[in-house]
Amino acid sequence: MSQLKVTLIKSAAHRLPKQRTIVKELGLGRVNSSVVLPNNEATRGAIFHIAHLIEVEEVK
C-alpha cells in the first residue's frame, strides 16, 4: 500500500476547532512540519477537511 507525505503549509491558528483537531491528530505541529501516513480512507477523509492548509504527495 502506498503512503502519503503530508506537509502543513498554512497555520491552523484562527481556523475552525474541527480543523485544528484534525491537524493535531495527523501529527502536524508547526508550519512546514511533515508526516508520512498510510493511504487509506480515514487518512484521505481527514485530508479532505484540511486540504487548504496542507500539501500532499505520494511516497512509495
Swiss-Prot record:
CDD domains hit by this protein: Ribosomal_L30
Pfam families, A to Z: Ribosomal_L30
Domain of life: Bacteria
Protein keywords: Ribonucleoprotein, Ribosomal protein
Gene3D superfamilies according to UniProt: Ribosomal protein L30, ferredoxin-like fold domain
Cellular component, GO, one term: cytosolic large ribosomal subunit
Keyword Iron-sulfur set for record: no
InterPro entries linked to this entry: Ribo_uL30_ferredoxin-like_sf, Ribosomal_uL30_bac-type, Ribosomal_uL30_ferredoxin-like
Gene Ontology MF: a single term: structural constituent of ribosome
GO biological process, any: translation
Keyword Ribosomal protein set for record: yes
Stretches of the chain forming a coiled coil according to its record: none
Quaternary data: Part of the 50S ribosomal subunit.
Membership in a protein family: Belongs to the universal ribosomal protein uL30 family.
HAMAP family linked: Ribosomal_uL30_B
Protein name: Large ribosomal subunit protein uL30
Organism of origin: Pediococcus pentosaceus (strain ATCC 25745 / CCUG 21536 / LMG 10740 / 183-1w)
Phylogenetic classification of the source organism: Bacteria, Bacillati, Bacillota, Bacilli, Lactobacillales
Gene field: rpmD
